[in-house]
């Protein structure tokens, strides 16, 4: 089970929302790239980044902040939020983003998904399904798609998608525990690779999700539980480290440049 830390960006800052409510935000750091370095130092293998502003406007509002994260780290970054055209996807992939997450556009313009899969392949293009009571929601969770979550997944599967990021909106940002039953029901019907998201409280939730690995649930995105240090290992890190330095260079681009120069 791969643990994927989440970084949500709103107004250029690293924030967390509760159930996707833009009026219930908590700012954790002014610089998202600083948060990315912290997660990298805590052994993250992949980081999930969302441009919350773009999810509403459809424009890459925090592109520069995302590029800064990509330039800083030496691990893959996936980005979601407001990616609604082929140009949007290309712009992110061109700066080194590992893969992009298509959300609202999968409902409003499903042919875009086929186009992107054909050009970049299924490793670079995944679909995010954010569900409330089994119905997929779009446009920053402000609109209903009128489609059942698993039906949308099967449609995307027919278009070549291999992975779904499945978020239980009713749990997201609440620390009330992962939506085990909803995730299980979705996984049973979708029969795809699935990254679970929403509501993770602690290690007991990870143990539950591990029981779904045979259904394709092989990874989980964790936000607030990591920010609020709900895992014992995080407390140990702080006990043995006087401070977390943010000056270490993780830049893949600079490492390559130094290698060539040497």
Swiss-Prot record:
Signal peptide: none annotated. It is an enzyme of class 5 (isomerase). It catalyses: 1-(5-phospho-beta-D-ribosyl)-5-[(5-phospho-beta-D-ribosylamino)methylideneamino]imidazole-4-carboxamide = 5-[(5-phospho-1-deoxy-D-ribulos-1-ylimino)methylamino]-1-(5-phospho-beta-D-ribosyl)imidazole-4-carboxamide. Its main location: cytoplasm. Keywords: Amino-acid biosynthesis, Cytoplasm, Histidine biosynthesis, Isomerase. InterPro entries: Aldolase_TIM (IPR013785), His_biosynth (IPR006062), HisA_bact_arch (IPR006063), Isoase_HisA-like (IPR044524), Isoase_HisA-like_bact (IPR023016), RibuloseP-bd_barrel (IPR011060). It comes from the Bacteria. One of its GO terms (biological process) is L-histidine biosynthetic process. It is found in: Cytoplasm. GO terms for molecular function: 1-(5-phosphoribosyl)-5-[(5-phosphoribosylamino)methylideneamino]imidazole-4-carboxamide isomerase activity. The active site is at residues 8, 130. One of its GO terms (cellular component) is cytoplasm. Its EC number is 5.3.1.16. Pathway: Amino-acid biosynthesis; L-histidine biosynthesis; L-histidine from 5-phospho-alpha-D-ribose 1-diphosphate: step 4/9. PANTHER family: 1-(5-PHOSPHORIBOSYL)-5-[(5-PHOSPHORIBOSYLAMINO)METHYLIDENEAMINO] IMIDAZOLE-4-CARBOXAMIDE ISOMERASE (PTHR43090:SF2). Belongs to the HisA/HisF family. This is 1-(5-phosphoribosyl)-5-[(5-phosphoribosylamino)methylideneamino] imidazole-4-carboxamide isomerase. It comes from Chloroherpeton thalassium (strain ATCC 35110 / GB-78). The gene is hisA.
């Amino acid at each position: 089970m791969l643990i994927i830390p989440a970084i949500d960006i709103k107004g250029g800052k690293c924030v967390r929302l509760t159930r996707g409510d833009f009026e219930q935000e908590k700012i954790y750091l002014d610089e998202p790239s600083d948060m990315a370095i912290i997660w990298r130092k805590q052994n993250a293998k992949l980081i999930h980044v969302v441009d919350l502003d773009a999810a509403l406007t459809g424009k890459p509002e925090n592109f520069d902040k995302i590029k800064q994260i990509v330039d800083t780290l030496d691990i893959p970054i996936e980005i979601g939020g407001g990616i609604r055209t082929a140009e949007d996807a290309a712009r992110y992939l061109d700066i080194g983003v590992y893969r992009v997450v298509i959300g609202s556009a999968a409902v409003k313009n499903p042919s875009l998904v086929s186009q992107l899969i054909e050009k970049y392949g299924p490793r670079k293009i995944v679909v995010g399904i954010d569900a409330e009571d089994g119905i997929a929601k779009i446009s920053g969770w402000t609109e209903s798609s009128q489609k059942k979550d698993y039906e949308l997944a099967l449609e995307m599967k027919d278009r070549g998608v291999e992975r779904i990021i499945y978020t239980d909106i009713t749990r997201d940002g609440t620390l009330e525990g992962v939506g085990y039953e909803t995730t299980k029901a979705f996984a049973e019907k979708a029969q795809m690779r699935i990254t679970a998201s929403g509501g993770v409280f602690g290690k007991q939730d990870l143990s539950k999700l591990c029981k779904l690995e045979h259904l394709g649930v092989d990874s989980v995105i964790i936000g607030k539980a990591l920010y609020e240090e709900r895992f014992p290992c995080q407390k140990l890190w702080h006990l043995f480290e006087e401070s977390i330095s943010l000056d270490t260079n993780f830049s893949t681009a600079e490492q390559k440049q130094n290698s060539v120069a040497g």
